[in-house]
């Protein structure tokens, strides 16, 4: 199927070893793993589209999003999703779509999980397959329609706490990229390249041997914009209700594509030790005194 990879054992084992590096960092930084459904109801997509369109317009015009009304513009993932509209021969009352990412699904649950300042910070992550109808030329590991996706979502008491989370995410990136032996650039994206639903985006680009860059991860600061749309509030220490501030951090199998591009050539691929499916140790065999001196 175009844009949907078949993983053979060697490649899948390598990908799982990369995942293990991420799991380790998540455990160190007190993130908890979750798993959300693949299908999301259509009404949540409409909610996201209205929010993202308004945030995008506000950023372009340099005004506060609260000063704008919801627009009819489709600024979310609507043009990229795969739809499920039938169950057997029966048409569904509410169409479902395959998740392109999980903000809408997760943030529907956050108001049930967050009630007090004692519930913060909330730090969760999942590793799942997501689906986006990528209309451009697909390429294994680099631009696909079924994505092996890591996503971390956090909620915090205020903007400053969320900003500190972004810095922690960047430290996590440093650790993982060091294990993968990938040189990177971390850069705040300009307005036109910021995720439409974010206050700002920091992209992480691997520097490839030909001098070009390949984005391998991204961190987004949402401030309280999504919390207002999904009514995610908490009671602060003064018994007043406030909206949480949120962040996200994502990576995909593009990491493996970067590893292949960096450490492979026409003669083959040399894996970094941390993700090599097979480990080889060369042991010198010493038999004579003369050979001992030589070694």
Predicted feature locations:
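NTP/phosphate- and nucleic-acid-binding module
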Residues: 1-295
